[in-house]
């Protein structure tokens, strides 16, 4: 019965993560109809940015809350908030309302990937856990790629509102699965005291930072008042946050985690890999269509081997970690991603679909060798009481790196275009920037402790506060 309930939990986690991942991209093909229906063209980009902002900012918060209050109740709370945001987004009567409801949706979505990965980390042993997290990474990638297609189909054959309503029946199934199959063991000790001051300072600081990054990407400069102002606010808020966290009995982000070499190396490597990865996903299709003259369909096809490589190597990376340790695996992954960007920087107008597919596959293999091994190594290193916070921080830094990387690469492209260079030359500058970032990530990967399979296996023998049961 326990195995059956464990499978139900995994199904509920995968289903909810699929919905959250798809929602990050599903609106892209629906937005022309949304603008025609609601107006607000001048602020429509915040339909995307608002979701990204709240989902990113809340990742560490959700992770820590799950450590303090229990995985089940916090995960269900986040899932319900996500579904409420979905329902209200479908009912929106103005662009301003839609943006607000999308931010509510993102608030819930921030919990789903972070706590979902944490639940998997507690339910399974090392090798099985890595395989399951590989599957979840695959679910995320497939859902993100399917989003625009699903959005287009729903918009054409039903209504743009159904890109939000579609979450409700499937989300209800996920709620039922998690609610009935997952049980939190009682937390011993006194009632936890929530770090409200740290929560406010962290939210304000990271929100201001992301607003500055998003604005810099939009205007292609980092010197405007609309960028510098939020950056100053972010610096002040985060400085206060560091002071508050050092004194808080139950900090929302336990700074002591960064004294652990594995956590620090994984956070920095994930941040840099995220900068490069999100840039590739965003600018590769643009190059293929605008410079090489491929169709939108062909450009989309090129991203498929990227996802397949990521999924395949995520699943098999556990065996590699068990045999040779995680530093070698992570370094090999970053070298593959570096090779992919080196090949991207050599693209030309005569690029063939086969070569583009090859390079995307190499990049996907690199990400698969990097992300899941770092996550399972961190989960096997930290105390069980910090598992949610540590898992969330790794994913937070990867997402934050992606947002900053997109902005930097967008600025590079705009600055090169302003010099009169062709779009192809401008995009070459973007890929060279990604190559430099990858080289820095390789150096960061060497900071990952060598590790041995025996060490991971011993670290995996911990008490288990999350279980399956009736």
Named regions from a protein language model:
Residues 1-6, 188, 448-470:
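Intrinsic disorder in cytosolic terminal tails and internal cytosolic loops
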Residues 34-35, 65-66, 150-158, 213, ...:
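Interfacial helix-cap and linker-helix signal at transmembrane-aqueous boundaries
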Residues 1-180, 316-317, 323-324, 328-330, ...:
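Transmembrane-helix bundle of Major Facilitator Superfamily
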Residues 190-202:
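Membrane-interface "helix-start" segments
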Residues 9-29, 45-50, 138, 197, ...:
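12-transmembrane solute porter fold
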